[in-house]
Amino acid sequence: DEVGRKHNDIDKDLNRAMHDSRMVYTCGDRSHADCLDDAQIAKMDLVCRKVGLRPGMKVLELGCGWGSFARYAAETYGAEVTGVTISKEQVELGCEICKGLPVEIRYQDYREVSGVYDRVISIGILEHVGYKNYRVYMKTVDRTLKDDGIAFFHTIGGNVSIVIGNPWTTRYIFPNGQIPSIAQLGK
């Protein structure tokens, strides 16, 4: 709850000013984009193509933010998406953004998710999880993913394994979080 309040439940108008029109919070794919909106659409489409998303597939998005990816996957690929976030503000706006689509945005901790999904998508949440919780996070993915399912992880990565985050980053950007290394995620 603390992370949700400090990091995500801030002024909606500020967030709208900082992000693209879909309120995508993570980096985009600028390889063929001329503006932020196009870069975010290109990133979301790349994720959908990489996981082979098809109509009717059930998708779990961990750390769904304002529902931007969930909306895109449902509108463009016909997926049925369940997104979870620990931000009440994100749930409220996400439900509004995804109204009328086969999307459910839940106020729920990733550790409490149940069900089985064709795809599990994780875009920009590992930075918030913290190294002490990587194993539990990966167990959640394993528990909720069908045997023939595909999981997708998009995160900022570090070259060095750290257990204490940068004080400035921890205070102003990722409360209780840190940048994961491949070694930490592989344990």
Over which residues does each language-model region extend?
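Conserved beta-strand signature within the Rossmann-like core of class I S-adenosyl-L-methionine
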Residues: 148-156
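Conserved class I S-adenosyl-L-methionine
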Residues: 56-63
